[in-house]
Each structure stands twice: as structure tokens, then as C-alpha cells.
Amino acid sequence: MTEEARRIVIEHAVEGTRLRESYFNGNADKVVDGARRMAVTLAKGHKLLFCGNGGSAADAQHLAAEFVNRFQMERPPLPAIALTTDTSIITAIGNDYSFDQIFEKQVQALGNEGDMLVGISTSGNSPNVVRAMHAARERGLATMGLTGRGGGEMAGLCDILFDVDHGRTALVQEVHITIGHLLCGLTDHFLFENVLALQPWLKDATNA
């Protein structure tokens, strides 16, 4: 291994560690709140929808899998759908209408009032994710966003926004999946280990 290659590894790891430490020091309460919102959504019999492009599509599928299968603890499957996986649906919409509508039309077909849409976009401006957010709000879904660079257009469309304001997309993505893992673990915690903590929100739908 050359010294230059080793330096690249260490610098990336150090910068990523600093970013995660800084982000979670400032946003730990927001992550807990996001997980509580997810838990309330699921406890009320609703579902989670995920969408994103490229690496964010992979994150959407990753997180949906953690909910449907399990994360760390043994528990019943939880309803979550990644809108990035059905190539027939995606190519039909993209071919007949527009790539910008591939998630929007799925939200219109699958999303119901009380569900939650989680949109992932490192720019916050992916047109198909933005349109999906608009569709979700029109149908009465809660909206959560994982973004970078200030949140972009998604900032004004999300009930709760996790914006990792950093210039390197790769590091933003690394924090996104850490946020996602924490949301999975904390949602399980609220649903199966600390159910009493959810009671105030289960009684009062306006706070969910």
C-alpha cells in the first residue's frame, strides 16, 4: 500500500467521523423525534414508503428491508415499501409519462392518509422525489426527508428534515445510512421496549 493511498483512507475516515460526531451532537433529539413519528405511524396501522435515486435508492431499499425483516432485535415484520424496486412500474411510468413521476404515481397508488413517505436526496432537489413529496402531502401522508446542502426544495415539504449540510456527497450518504439505522433501532425501541413513551401521541393524533 502506498503512503498516498493510506493517507486517502485515513483522511476520509477522520473527516467522516468528525461529520458524524458534529451532526449527531446537534441533532440527536431530532433523530429520536423522527423515530417516534415512525413508531406512531406503524402503531396506528399505517406504513412507511421510501424513495430516492442512485445511492439514495439503495438506502431506500436497505431501510425498507430492515423494517420488513428486522434490524437488530427479533420482532414482527413492519410494513415498509421501497418505491425503487419494481422495474416494470418504474419503466412504464418513465416511458409513458416522465422519469420525474416514477415515485409520484406510486405514492398516489399506494399511499394512504396516515402513512409516511421518506424521501432521500443528497441535493434535496431530485425532481422525482420532490414530486413524490407534493403527492404525499396532498394525500395526507407524513413526510420525512434525508438531504444535504441545506435541504433544497425538499426543505419546505418535509414534516421532519435530516439535512446533512456538507459538500461531499459520499460523506452525506454515510451519515444518511447512520441516521437510517438509528431510526430503525429507535423505532423498534419505541414499539417493543418502551411502548409507554408512545401513549401520549397514540391518544392525540394531532401530535403524530
Curated annotation (Swiss-Prot):
The keyword Isomerase applies. One of its GO terms (biological process) is D-glycero-D-manno-heptose 7-phosphate biosynthetic process. The keyword Cell membrane does not apply. Its EC number is 5.3.1.28. Substrate binds at residues 53-55, 66, 95-96, 121-123, 126, 173. It catalyses: 2 D-sedoheptulose 7-phosphate = D-glycero-alpha-D-manno-heptose 7-phosphate + D-glycero-beta-D-manno-heptose 7-phosphate. This is Phosphoheptose isomerase. It comes from Nitratidesulfovibrio vulgaris (strain ATCC 29579 / DSM 644 / CCUG 34227 / NCIMB 8303 / VKM B-1760 / Hildenborough) (Desulfovibrio vulgaris). The lineage of its organism: Bacteria, Pseudomonadati, Thermodesulfobacteriota, Desulfovibrionia, Desulfovibrionales.
